[in-house]
Swiss-Prot record:
Family per similarity comment: Belongs to the orthopoxvirus OPG001 family.
Keywords attached to this entry: Early protein, Host-virus interaction, Inhibition of host chemokines by virus, Secreted, Signal, Viral immunoevasion
InterPro entries for the chain: Chemkine-bd_vir, Orthopox_35kDa, Pox_vCCI-like_sf
Ranges for region Disordered: 62-87
UniProt protein name: Chemokine-binding protein
Leader sequence residues: 1-17
Gene name in the database record: OPG001
Amino acid sequence: MKQYIVLACMCLAAAAMPASLQQSSSSCTEEENKHYMGIDVIIKVTKQDQTPTNDKICQSVTEITESESDPEVESEDDSTSVEDVDPPTTYYSIIGGGLRMNFGFTKCPQIKSISESANGNAVNARLSSVPLGQGKDSPAITRAEALAMIKDCELSIDIRCSEEEKDSDIQTHPVLESNISHKKVSYEDIIGSTIVDTKCVKNLEFSVRIGDMCKESSDLEVKDGFKYVDGSVSEGVTDDTSLIDSTKLKSCV
């Protein structure tokens, strides 16, 4: 369930979801019960006018996976088990363009590509899975597992100001994107919470889309969207097909 709270210099909100691309059919399996699920997260940030300009993108990317529960649980016979363990959450911290963007993914498709662009007060980022045949393949899962992933995937976002001065660390390879179609699909609550420091962030728009990267299937594709513009919040209205100019993005990983 989406919710938001506006604080002094912070906006706490729930978020939303967007879209991706289309995979090499030659790499995809025709097996009916195999699905290669992907995720595509697109972020558009407009910084406050007084914020210093910083066009250094991809200054650093950090990935950490952790679980909130202790995996060792005492049983009645004094032995230990691994039951009741919360699913791990993978966090990505991206520093660039005068911002630190932190993303948390729980029970979601794997992120394999991270890219960023900056021009003046505009900072854009994209995190996505990668289609088959790109050397970073996601594992195939069953239809039941894919439906559960759509239902359970949760994304959190935390965007803060950054004064990092290190140089950009842009990768030379092209930006890899997922292969999810851009057709109209139903909305799903995928975002947990979004924290935005309004000291440096004026507007925020982002979208998320989850879908099969090999097969177009309406019941295996969902999206969500969120806007925070001039102090007003809108949910589920972001057009992920035109949110940013993807040709300007540079690979961070």
